[in-house]
Amino acid sequence: DGPGVIRHIWITVDNKTSDGDCFVLRDLVLRMYWDDEENPSVETPLGDFFCCGFGQECIVNSSVIAVVPSRGLNSYFAMPFHKHARIVIENQHKNPIPAFFYQIDYCLYASLPANTSYFHAQWRRQALTEIGKDYVILDGIKGTGQYIGTYLGLSTLQRYWWGAVSYTHLTLPTKL
């Protein structure tokens, strides 16, 4: 119970439940609720929140997200709340997860400024985009705040490299 600010979240989890299984990080869903919200301000697969897309673990080194080789998932985003914070992990995986450990570091305060912004994160995927139609990255957020950034994972639906394009029809400038 708050007011307070979550300063650091550390999670480690087995990323496989068998040799042929590699989607634990995609199948664990992270939801965060601030104060009396009915709908989560954060709703994303656990791995994608920590910039490890497609259920694959990877190394990340940034000022707000760090994923270390020993599967330590770290978030340093400031996540303020006025009354209370609720963090939920839902297992949508086909098997039980044998190990899940976490630590949440936070500070409690007498009060927070009335204009304190809440932290939001959304996840979405789309198999095909449409030419001329904007791809929505963040939707339905009300109030003022700061846009911190986007983690974008890209994959191909084709068997071969998706970047192969013929440039023979293009005319290039002769001078720069």
Language-model segments: what does each one mean?
Residues D1-V24, N95-V165:
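Solvent-exposed, flexible loop/coil segments flanking beta-strands in beta-rich domains
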Residues R86:
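Active-site scaffold segments
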Residues E38-S41, T129, R159-W161, T171:
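Short, surface-exposed beta-strand/loop "edge" segments at domain boundaries and coil↔beta transitions
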Residues D1-I65:
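An N-terminus-focused feature that recognizes amino-terminal "leader" regions
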Residues I89-N91:
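Asparagine-centered strand-capping/turn motif at beta-strand->loop junctions
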Residues N61-K83:
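Beta-sandwich interaction modules
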Residues T168-T174:
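Conserved small/polar residues in nucleotide/adenosyl-binding loops
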Residues R26, I59, R71-L73, G163:
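Residues that act as N-cap/strand-start positions at coil-to-secondary-structure junctions
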